[in-house]
Amino acid sequence: MLKKYLSNKTINLLEYYSTLNINNIFSNDITKSKHWSFANKEMLVSQLFKEINDQLNTKNNNNFFYKGNPDSQIMILGDFPNDDDVKNQEILSGSRGELLNKMLSSISLDKEKYYLSNIYFDKETDIRNRNNFYKDILIKHLKIIKPKYILLLGEIVSNFFNNSKNKILDIHGKWDSIIINKDKFITFTTFDPEILLGEPENKKLSWEDLKKFRNEIYKNL
């Protein structure tokens, strides 16, 4: 009966996750709680990032994995680290990070008001061969942070959520949602700042997206 109330993309995503057997991701009682403390969230994300480092045989620090406030109801997701991020050991750094900061400041979002991370944490050519691993990581990540809103930066991130191949000009500025177990996450897609650096003509579209996102979150948070 539930399926008739869900979009096809949500149904497909749920069915995909069921094939990965990720209905109960954490057995620890802490992770079953609806209201974790800031300290518990930090501990859990650190454990998650250790799992990623172990899988990738890397020693990246926490600044490479996230920025901002784990208690925020606003999560921002980029795609994968670029050379600046790897060199600086900091997520979305360099010119891309500078532009993102300006974009977020324009809608009064400083790093205490959001939690920023990626869906991928390496940039190897076979990265998509690890999609199952990264989908599992993302589900764990969402269950820890429990954001109400997720701002998706670019088509790679949006398509990762929806198992699709849409172009950013077709999907930017659009709301959607996913449901994982009983948790609902509202998503909104806009441009990756790295794309805007190469295609500045799309900055006006990005600004319209951000205003739309701002109006929604300040009305409901």
Enumerate the predicted regions with their spans.
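A polyanion-binding, active-site-adjacent surface
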Residues: 16-19, 23-221
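N-terminal low-complexity, Ser/Thr- and acidic-residue-enriched intrinsically disordered segments
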Residues: 2-24
